[in-house]
Amino acid sequence: MNAPHTMHRTKKLPPLRVGVGGPVGSGKTTLLEMLCKAMRDKYDLVAITNDIYTKEDQRLLTVAGALPAERIMGVETGGCPHTAIREDASINLEAVDRMLTRFPDADIVFIESGGDNLAATFSPELSDLTIYVIDVAGGEKIPRKGGPGITKSDLLVINKTDLAPMVGANLDVMASDAARMRGARPFAMCNLKALEGLDEVISFIERKGLLVG
């Protein structure tokens, strides 16, 4: 039986579900804010945020004006954040269904996970594309530590490149390690606060998500 949002959808292609994961403080919410502001005039967007005990990221996106408040939904996961996006994604799958019932013609559903470790990944039932965000302040060694977030995500974002001189990180080393760990999978060096690298992320979403020819 078709879900309500499927029956009322007028667009031919299904909505693209983009999962955004990464450790606490890496810049996931900043990335989501910048993506929404840059893409909302071209695409029909909705966003779902995950926090363990609050809906702080939903509030931050709303206050920042990333999207109208009704297009942003906060999910309180409780417990381990990765469980709600991988082992038992039912709470997020339900949130996606609710948002698509309200906005059946959404082009993209962004799903931000709660802050987690390098082993966190999205269930393929929940996300079509995964973006994993790490930051330079976490240390030059982060890319070579591996883990599914580093090696298996569709796009790795290395954020806060502007902080490299302050923390003694060599960006060339980080880029080399990322390329070695990821093989053919792409990565982007970004300073999202200054919008540096954002166009590269948007281009990836459009190209890999088949939003453009």
Curated annotation (Swiss-Prot):
InterPro entries: CobW/HypB/UreG_nucleotide-bd (IPR003495), P-loop_NTPase (IPR027417), UreG (IPR004400)
Primary localisation category: cytoplasm
Highest taxon listed in the record's lineage: Bacteria
Binding residue positions for GTP: 22-29
Disulfide-bonded cysteines: none
UniProtKB keywords: Chaperone, Cytoplasm, GTP-binding, Nickel insertion, Nucleotide-binding
Alphabetical list of HAMAP family matching this protein: UreG
Subunit structure: Homodimer. UreD, UreF and UreG form a complex that acts as a GTP-hydrolysis-dependent molecular chaperone, activating the urease apoprotein by helping to assemble the nickel containing metallocenter of UreC. The UreE protein probably delivers the nickel.
Protein name: Urease accessory protein UreG
Source organism per UniProt: Paraburkholderia phymatum (strain DSM 17167 / CIP 108236 / LMG 21445 / STM815) (Burkholderia phymatum)
Organism ancestry: Bacteria, Pseudomonadati, Pseudomonadota, Betaproteobacteria, Burkholderiales
